Amino acid sequence: MNRRSFLARSTGAVTLPFLVNGLPVHAFDGPLLADLFNLAEESDRVLVLVQLNGGNDGVNTVLPIDQEAAYKAARSNIAIPMSAALKLNDALGLHPAMADLHRTFGEQKVAVLNGVGYPNPNQSHFRSTDIWMSGSSSNQVVSSGWVGRYLDGVYPGYPDGYPTAAMPDPIAIQMSAVVSLALTGVQQQSMGMALQDPETFYDLVQGTTSGGGGLPSQAEARSNVAFIRDVQGKAQVYSAVIKEAAAKADNIADYGDTRVNRLAAQLQIVARMVAGGLKTRVYVVSLGGFDTHAAQTLEGEPTNGSHAVLLGYVSAAMAAFQRDLEAHGVQDRVLTMTFSEFGRRVASNLSLGTDHGTSAPMFIMGSKVIDGIRTPYPSLTDLDRGDLKMSIDFRQVYASVLEQWFGADPAVIRQILFQDFETVPIIKAGSTTHVDDATSAGGLTLYAISPNPVRGTATIRYRVDAALPVRVDVYDALGFHVATLAEGHHSHGEHSAPFNTSTLPSGTYHVRCSQGRQHVTAAMVVVR
């Protein structure tokens, strides 16, 4: 079943007397319908979150070459020889198991953020995970996630009324049995769907199992949070588009033995869905085992052990994922970011392990990343009761991603993260997101809408190469006309029209530029 057929069946569009958001679906009929269905399949930026469950030991992940004496004194029984470190610069190096990611770093596609944490850190796995996923302070208990709140603003009312012509695909996908707090919206509704494991994906693609029932309504979400979070097996409405995307692309990069490296198995699937044109905005994958209280290294072999194996998995999986994206030509659309609920203490314990700590490094990978060491490494001697002090708040990283990758307005970011946070440059200049690249038809070109998403006034830029009347219109997600921005003869060359969105509700709108029989359409997201 192709995407158009799937949407027609699932919403009753055009031919069946169904309603969408209380409006008759014949509003979708006519030439605009074709435009909405034929919007660029690869129009949105993608964020891939890699969760390292258990609390990753950052001190043995990014090695402090320039603090070697303090490092050896604090953890002599698990200290990795600095001669084995994979140098990032003269001061820092990666664990020797991370050769693949080190090569990607050398290709200027990896940013390293050291000392990422938050004030008054909590060393409980469950509580600290909630803090990272909710984007809250340690003294706040929040029942929604930072990504969920962002997506909730971009796709208001989800899941009611979805899929739509503008967003026919899952908004977010988590490779897990349930959707995590990070993807939970303000009404405690899941903003995505869960694929329990890689086997579930391949069963779905091969048709050996169904996607389950439809998504529950928002009313059900409010009355039964667990039900809406546990959407695995209930997202049949999206199974067809996932199968269609998977059929469009095969993995090109070598991911190694994915039966052993489960992170590689998950990222392999994400690459296939992105390359296949799925418009999903956020993916969440994970790897467990980082709670290394004991046997983190082998006795007398500090470069080997459970932590080395895990870091090797992360390194190989992320590097293969980046190569796969590049082989498919979609690398500019994807940003990959690691996180863990906390780091480990500076001092090792007597069991060849480390105990719960505070700050730890994050890796951000992508072709648009400002590569290199982005934040300073904490001191191994100036400690907070034996723990590393933080160099940067994790919410500064979130704010930077929201602003520089997704193009979110600072006022929107303040609402998402509950306060203002200073950002750190992580995305190359000129790479700020827009929903659609320039599209052309005949002598007509519609450029990227800026900013996008937009809170106030957007600028619509277009180029005219033929001496015919031009019309620029805005429609809402149901196909109803909202505004005409320009109409009449235009001189040859580029033109622009401002569009004040301050009176519009949040949601996805469509700008349609027409000239004779030629027309081009781009999506624009309004946030409040």
Residue ranges, per PLM feature:
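Histidine-centered active-site microenvironments of extracellular/periplasmic hydrolases
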Residues: 340-371
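Glycine-rich, phosphate-binding/catalytic loops in enzymes
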Residues: 65-68, 354-356, 435, 491
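Low-complexity, Pro/Thr/Ser/Gly/Ala-rich linker/spacer regions in secreted
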Residues: 429-441
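C-terminal outer-membrane/trafficking sorting elements
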Residues: 440-450, 454-528
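Short, glycine/acidic-enriched loop or turn micro-motifs at the edges of active sites
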Residues: 54, 294, 344, 455, ...
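Feature for exported/extracytoplasmic and membrane-associated proteins, marking the mature portion
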Residues: 1-315, 320-328, 347, 364-367, ...
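Beta-strand segments within the central parallel beta-sheet cores of soluble alpha/beta enzyme folds
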Residues: 284, 332-339
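Residue-level detector of short, conserved catalytic/binding motifs and their immediate flanks
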Residues: 45-46, 171, 334, 360, ...
